[in-house]
Amino acid sequence: MKKTLAFLLTLTLLMTIMAGCSHQQMPSPADPVTLNIWHVYGSQTISPLNTLIDEFNRSVGREHGITVNVVSVTSSSAIDEALSASANNEPGAEAMPDLFTAYPRVAEIVGKENLLPWDDYFTENELSAFHAEFLTEGYFGDRLLMLPVAKSAEAFFLNQTLFDRFCADTGITSDDLASFEGVFQTARTYYDWSGGQSFIQINDYYHYAYVGMKAHGVELVRGGTLQLDEDAFRSIWTPLAEAAIYGGICLDEGYAAARWKTAEVIANTGSTADVLYQPSEVIYSDNTTEAIKAMAYPYPTFTDGASGVIYRGGGLFAMKSSDERRNQAAVIFAKWLTEEEHNLTFVTNAGYLPVTDNAFDALFSDLNQIEKENYRSVYAAVETMLDSYTFYALPLYDGASETQLDFEANVKAVLKSARNQYVKRIGNGEDPETVMEALIAASLAELISLSGT
């Protein structure tokens, strides 16, 4: 009897201790937690995520004693650099944030062992609510280190107001923008019609090349090496180079949205999230302004039989803490952010796609619920692509980030040089067709040389 009583007393004591520990491991208003976050959503304008974070802090955050503090809103490349500086304790580096949004490549920068495994805190049922492909990207081995919060696809954006004016004079129509062949022909025609203005800016040549090669049944990257000597690459390089050398493609650095504001270009390919930065008017060189209508169209195709597009977007990472309250606070915020209502509010104000199946279905069941016409056109374009396009995630391989950045820089440098030579040689009286043909071939050879393939 005494042994039984002693056992029961010991068991009761252990349960009390465990309950107390469990309570102590959760944030509360009496024992609050502040989490610092770096993110990429809205670095050039009002941030939809900041607005939602404010809502969290006023509601669920207050109930649990959690404050999410936005420290930095910037580009993904800037976050990569800042994380690297913090991880390496470089002089002047910021303290490592508790939460950050980034691409999978950063796991190596901060160390996978230092990241919070979300699968330890989400039940199987909770994880099953996520769109399977989006969730898969976040796994490193068997650990879920990157939680999807928003994804984007690529689309074709158009200043419809100025384009319609151009169409009235030339007979070009929006149907000509369905393929890259048509886009590049339109770019040359626009250059002539406008007196020397570029038509389009391509925000990501690596994506252009990746999807273009896929359309021809060939991989852009094999064994970590670009396959630029393939006939398939030559077939997608030639029309691109011709339009760029002619002057129809803007090759300068910077964002397309900035050039929309001054009508330096009237179109671009880029992330669906570009809609967040599109201006509602243009300012001309004489300081007059004009209201414009911006519209989105599906990503142009390369061949009749193969339509493809990149989907992208990083996810939410959390630094693992020895203070379990901080881990729990990160999880509470992450679960709140990915709930259908909050996730839809966030993504539809930023041009992104929701990350759970239910939210996905709710969005595309009725696009009329989206008030702004330019945003509605983005999701209409995505809906079209969901029906008939293959969606590709970029491959991860050693040096992928550097390869992509180098390719972007090399394409622009090679085409800028060819463009300058074209203007000079034509000005000296050489035959335009002969010069163009030579420069297309020379630019490809130079790109292959620079890429080391």
Where are these regions (language model features)?
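Hinge/lid segment of periplasmic solute-binding proteins
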Residues: 100-155, 181-184, 289-300
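Short, solvent-exposed loop/beta-turn-alpha elements that line the ligand-binding surface or hinge
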Residues: 119-130, 173-175, 216-236, 242, ...
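Extracytoplasmic/periplasmic substrate-recognition and gating elements
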Residues: 248, 285-358
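Conserved C-terminal helix/tail region of periplasmic/extracytoplasmic solute-binding proteins
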Residues: 383-453
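Short, polar/charged alpha-helical segment
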Residues: 43-65
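Glycine-centered hinge/linker elements that transmit conformational signals in sensory
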Residues: 184-188, 222-254, 294-299
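Extracytoplasmic/periplasmic solute-binding protein
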Residues: 141-149, 154-156, 181-226, 234, ...
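Extracytoplasmic "Venus flytrap"/periplasmic binding protein-like
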Residues: 62-130, 166, 266-267, 285-288
